Amino acid sequence: MTIKLINIGFGNIISANRMISIVSPESAPIKRMIQDARDRGMLIDATYGRRTRAVVVMDSDHIILSAVQPETVAHRLSVKEEIMDEGQG
């Protein structure tokens, strides 16, 4: 298994293999999930003080806040997978 890394903005890179989901921070359940992670010390804020636009849920129970749109993160992931597939063929 190869390690896939993905840029979530401002030079911050996470392991794509360990991502569970990328969601918008607007809904009340996601806001509660962010607050719970903050209380447990499992929140990683990668926004550099900017507005949170994407919430990345990791398999380690960490929650990562990003200032990049969820669609942008997903697009970067899909482009990365396409490049990897072309390299194997």
Swiss-Prot record:
It comes from Bacillus subtilis (strain 168). GO terms for molecular function: DNA binding. PANTHER family: REGULATORY PROTEIN SSL2874-RELATED (PTHR38449:SF1), REGULATORY PROTEIN TM_1690-RELATED (PTHR38449). Disruption phenotype: Mutation impairs pellicle formation, complex colony architecture and motility inhibition in a sinR mutant background. Mutant is defective in biofilm formation and also shows a delay in spore formation during biofilm formation. Pfam families: RemA-like. The lineage of its organism: Bacteria, Bacillati, Bacillota, Bacilli, Bacillales. The gene is remA. This is Extracellular matrix regulatory protein A. HAMAP family: RemA (MF_01503). The keyword ATP-binding does not apply. Regulates the biosynthesis of the extracellular matrix and the biofilm formation. Activates the transcription of the matrix biosynthesis operons eps and tapA-sipW-tasA. Also activates expression of the opuA operon, involved in osmoprotection. Acts by binding specifically to the promoter region of the target genes. Acts in parallel to the pathway that governs SinR derepression. Required for endosporulation. InterPro entries: RemA-like.
